[in-house]
Structures are given as C-alpha cells and as structure tokens.
A protein has these predicted regions:
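Catalytic "initiation/cleavage/transfer" segments centered on a nucleophilic residue
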Residues: 1, 126-214
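Signature for HUH/AEP ssDNA processing cores
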Residues: 1-103, 107-129, 213
Length: 214
C-alpha cells in the first residue's frame, strides 16, 4: 500500500526539490497520518528483554494471547492477523534457526485515528496486570516497557513484516501466519480514566516494585 509514483526523501531534500516535477514525500508526520474510518492497529510483542517476573505472569495467565485478552477482552472477537517479523527464523543454510521471540499482530479497529491512544491504554492496562517493567538504557535512563510496544503507534514508522529478500545460503523457516476472523472493534480506553505517565509509573515502581527493572 502507499502512494503511487512517490519518492520518499529527507525533509531537506524535499525542500530542495519543491520546484521539480518529482512528487516527493518525507517519512514524517508531515506526510503520513491515519485514515478516516477503520484501520489496523499493530501490536508488536517481543520476549527478548522481558524479565522473569513478566514471563511468569504471562504463563500464569495462559500465554501471550490469554494475557492480551485479559487486558483487552474485546480482542477475542476481533479481526486480527498475526505474522512474524521479517527476521524471524532466518539462518545460514545448515544451521538451526533460533526460535522467534515475538510477532506482529494487526487488529482491525473501527477508528484508525484511535491507534495511538489505544496503545497507551493497553500499556497502562499492562502495568495494572503486572505486565509492565523497566529497562535501563545505555545512557542510564529508566525506560518504561510492557508486553507491547507503544512506539509503533506513529503512522510514519516502518514495520518489518514482509518476507525478507535472502542472499545465497541464507534460509528462513518462517512461523505460520495466524488469521482470526471477527469484527472491527472499538479501541480500548485508559483504565479508570488514568493517562499513561512515565512519571507516575516510575513513582509506582519506586513505591511498590510490581515489575522488574533490568
């Protein structure tokens, strides 16, 4: 999908090409937005950095899909598609591919413009259910994380989900695609009218460590 006959350039290049006949866009919010009406919400899940406590909580709930329907019960009746990331189970010929550590789930929402707020709401619900945690960045900053990534809710971001182009002697044993037929659903709302706040979550972590910091 996307625009036909478009060239994606940097913002500086676009300014230089304004007078040319080329139809240019930048991969920024200046040129990318959410459509009116229905759209697909991306839930990006990866177990690579999950602390043991969060993995245990997911296991107690019955696995990742049970955890997702715990924080968002309407998901059970939704249209959604689950695919691995482009790099999942890619390996050199003759070697055993590593297990896929996550997936991309695309959920059909009634209003695409609700995608950013939906991810923030799900992130807050994750923290309420013991599915949130903190990471320490290389610079020493405390980063808020949960079993889904909030950052993918911006329309200009790339999602590496398509099958990769493989070079010689490189193979891929892709996990199967899961297609669930349902309906377009309303976006989840913030629990108890709370707004997700980094300051609040850090304060909660300091007062009562319900999630691990790594």
């Amino acid at each position: 999908y996307g625009e036909r006959d478009m060239i994606v350039v940097t913002r500086g290049s676009k300014n230089r090409l304004r007078t040319s006949s080329k139809n240019c866009i930048t991969r920024t919010k200046d040129d990318f937005g959410f459509p009116d009406g229905e759209g697909w919400l991306l839930l990006d899940h990866d177990t690579k950095d999950l602390p043991v406590s969060v993995k245990s909580k997911m296991a107690d709930l019955g696995g990742i899909f049970a955890a997702l329907t715990t924080i968002w019960p309407e998901l059970a009746g939704a249209d959604f598609l689950v695919r691995p990331s482009s790099s999942a189970r890619v390996c050199i010929a003759g070697e055993t591919p590593a297990d896929a550590t996550g997936f991309h789930m695309f959920v059909r929402l009634r209003s695409a413009s609700d995608i950013p707020s939906a991810l923030r709401a799900l992130h807050a619900r994750c923290w309420q259910h013991g599915l949130g945690y903190h990471l320490i960045s290389k610079s020493g900053q405390m980063l808020d994380r949960s079993i889904i990534h909030v950052s993918v809710g911006s329309p200009e971001r790339l999602s590496f989900t398509a099958p990769p182009i493989l070079g010689p002697n490189v193979l891929r044993q892709a996990p199967p695609t899961v297609c669930h037929e349902g309906v377009a659903v309303d976006a989840p709302r913030q629990p108890y009218d709370l707004t997700w706040s980094r300051t609040r979550d850090i304060a909660r972590q300091t007062a009562k460590p319900e999630a691990d910091a790594r």
